[in-house]
């Protein structure tokens, strides 16, 4: 197993609660970003994801930077949750997920920002609902209708 991916898995195992509620304060944020960047560059899958991110950045640099700053916990979950990683072996599935995330929040920046400062219970309920929607999209092999 890739060394950096293993380190990310170790961090993940130490986190409590729902995987999507990862808080950078629970680990060293600088170390997390370093590990994330190394993992993104370490295998073909992550290079593909990195290429997708670069494409998104070229399309809308400001929007992309805002998106990734607010979404670090999601990328950690995608990288080290084995069930999710198997679903993203095809880059098209990952693109569908990114499109889903952008449609969910980026279309409405205020709603997006408000979500990230919402009370934990409200956030947890929303994410659980969203996770079910995403699971359905993956199962059906298409985009949200």
Swiss-Prot record:
One of its GO terms (cellular component) is virion component. Keywords: Late protein, Virion. Induction: Expressed in the late phase of the viral replicative cycle. It comes from the Viruses. It is found in: Virion. Belongs to the asfivirus K145R family. This is Uncharacterized protein K145R.
């Amino acid at each position: 197993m890739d060394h950096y991916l293993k380190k990310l898995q170790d961090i993940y195992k130490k986190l409590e609660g729902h995987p999507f509620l990862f808080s950078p304060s629970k680990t060293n944020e600088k170390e997390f970003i370093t590990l994330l960047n190394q993992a993104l560059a370490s295998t073909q899958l992550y290079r593909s994801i990195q290429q997708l991110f670069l494409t998104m950045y070229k399309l809308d640099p400001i929007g992309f930077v805002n998106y990734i700053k607010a979404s670090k916990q999601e990328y950690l979950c995608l990288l080290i949750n084995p069930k999710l990683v198997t679903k993203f072996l095809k880059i098209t599935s990952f693109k569908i997920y990114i499109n889903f995330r952008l449609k969910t929040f980026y279309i409405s920046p205020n709603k997006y920002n408000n979500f990230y400062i919402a009370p934990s219970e409200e956030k947890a309920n929303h994410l659980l609902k969203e996770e079910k929607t995403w699971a359905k999209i993956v199962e059906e092999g298409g985009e949200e209708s």
